[in-house]
Amino acid sequence: METMIDSLTATRAEVNDVANSVMDGADAVMLSGETSVGKYPVEVIRTMTNILRTVESSELIVVPQEAPNIRTKRFITKSICYHASQLAKGIQAKAICTLTNSGYTAYQISAWRPSSHILVFTSNKRILTQLNLLWGVKAFYYNNLNSTDKTVTEINQIAMKMGYLEEEDMVVNLTSMPIEEKGMVNTLRVSIV
């Protein structure tokens, strides 16, 4: 979008570059000079947003749909994230809520591009900003890990207060059980809030 530093119109090649980044699965795109020293910072953001929305909503975008099948150390977590995304689509869940310590679960869910909100709760302040750059992810600080049941109830209530869920919405919750065992999501639960 570099020509938009001085021009209201992007070149065909620039539009193609932005579109290809979406088709390649990029979670985020970045502008630099276009908004910091450019003559049309608002217009360049509008143009890029329009390109991104158009390409993301295209039927030409194909998200891989094959379930994980290589039994690595993270096989259970990967499988649960995959099935959470599929289940959320099937039951039209409004959100997938998960806890994470490293961010791995958020990366996995985001990769499947579910239509549900991806709400990620972590006690690791270092990764909050990184998580919010992932496709579809909204990350929140949460540090009250008492029991799995209580935690699921609390994060669903937080999601309601933040406007991501309403009463009677379905939500897919991912946690580790016991909850003290951080690092390995092994539980998928469907709730109606």
Language model regions located:
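Active-site mouth loops of central-metabolism enzymes
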Residues: 1-13, 70, 74
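Conserved, mostly hydrophobic/aromatic
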Residues: 21, 109, 171
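C-terminal binding/interaction regions
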Residues: 160-174, 178, 185-190
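Nucleotide-binding motor/catalytic cores of P-loop/tubulin-like NTPases across gene-expression machines
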Residues: 105-107, 113-151
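Glycine-rich phosphate-binding active-site loops on the catalytic face of alpha/beta enzymes
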Residues: 18-41
